[in-house]
Amino acid sequence: MSLMTKLGLRALVASCLIAAGGAAHAQLNVLVTGVGSTQFPIATANFANEANSPQQISTIVRQDLQRSGKFTNIDAGSAPVSEGDSVDLGAWKAKGANAFVAGSVTKLPNGQYQVRFKLYDTVNQQSLGGLELVSPEGGLRMSAHKVADYIYAKLMGGRGVFATRLSYVIKTGNRYQLQISDSDGQDAHIALSSPEPIISPAWSPDGTKVAYVSFEKKKPIVYIHDLPTGRRVVVSDQKGNNSAPAWSPDGRTLAVALSRTGNTQIFAVNADGSGLRRLTQGSSIDTEPSYSPDGQSIYFTSDRGGQPQIYKMPASGEASGGAQRVTFTGNYNTSPRVSPDGKQLAYISRTGGGFKLYIQDLQSGVATALTDTTHDESPSFAANGQYILYATQVNGRGVLAAVSTDGRTRQVLSVQGGSVREPSWGPFMQ
């Protein structure tokens, strides 16, 4: 069986798994297992006036911090504490909290909501600042995620990804749904509903668009979907298969896998569908392109060596500098995704008859399995490079999962009564 056939079947099998789940609830349910090597103890008090708010901001913040695997929540009691209240930092330190968060939620005369908070360092007895966020009612959850991102950045020294979004595909009844949700699987909405499969969603670098493959015209066609307006543009409707869209870092170009010349090869196309040009040449199957974060290279899957492996070529095409093999652990490796810093490669490796998520240091070449499941697929890095989202199976049902790049923390995102596949983790919000 050819590589393209296998990959195509894998996509179709994923679609069948979605279908097998039946009707699906609109929200993802999150289960966190494992913790980081060290956890930062923090107490987040109930925010003042949030009892009258449509969303409990402090609860969402605590849940976000717990999901990261890097924090442990110290009980802050039930009494609300405003960012303007006098705080006994020594008392919170004595309770085991190295940081303390206080805040408030206020409904403004125009109907919007103001969220204010302050973060304290109880060890050094000082304020670490805070934010004032204003949003409509529907944006309160995102405001809470931004609070958690601020805390993460101040205490961990890197950007958090709580205020990012996910895309994934659910089969509900007889229709496929491309859904967009917050990073915790909540506040989900349907971007596209179709009676035919939808696969391979890929976020644009600015987070306003998603490219994907839809079978709505009884063949795979690549679309770009503008999320704010719902407007769609056909990017590639060539003869044969149109698949595996991947954005360039500047958002101007997509790499796609097309079979218009026979065997599947990698092409580049402008984001408006113009300027199609071929990037790989030869008789092998070349597919699943993924740009490096600097836009200079494309990683892709090819069977040119007899078995599917991951290769790297210049973004202008292999005619400009050839293609170099990247993976050497195992004899079947697919689905390359490069970390945002360009230092690591996530991919799927067939091991012992199953498919596992691996991560490889691109400098040393050392590869490590991150999971113990056997049906992993579709890896996608978080924008900060600390986590990888992927699809897998638990008890025979398709779920999404996220694992930290050190393998210590795992999240499972499932849909009640159904299966979910085809995940993609969105970029930092602009």
From Swiss-Prot:
SUPFAM superfamilies: TolB, N-terminal domain, Tricorn protease N-terminal domain. Keywords: Cell cycle, Cell division, Periplasm, Signal. The Tol-Pal system is composed of five core proteins: the inner membrane proteins TolA, TolQ and TolR, the periplasmic protein TolB and the outer membrane protein Pal. They form a network linking the inner and outer membranes and the peptidoglycan layer. This is Tol-Pal system protein TolB. Part of the Tol-Pal system, which plays a role in outer membrane invagination during cell division and is important for maintaining outer membrane integrity. NCBIfam families: propeller_TolB. GO terms for biological process: cell division; protein import. It is found in: Periplasm. One of its GO terms (cellular component) is periplasmic space. The keyword Signal applies. InterPro entries: 6-blade_b-propeller_TolB-like, PD40, Tol-Pal_TolB, TolB_N. The keyword Signal applies. It holds the Pfam family TolB_N. Residues 1-26 form the signal peptide. Belongs to the TolB family.
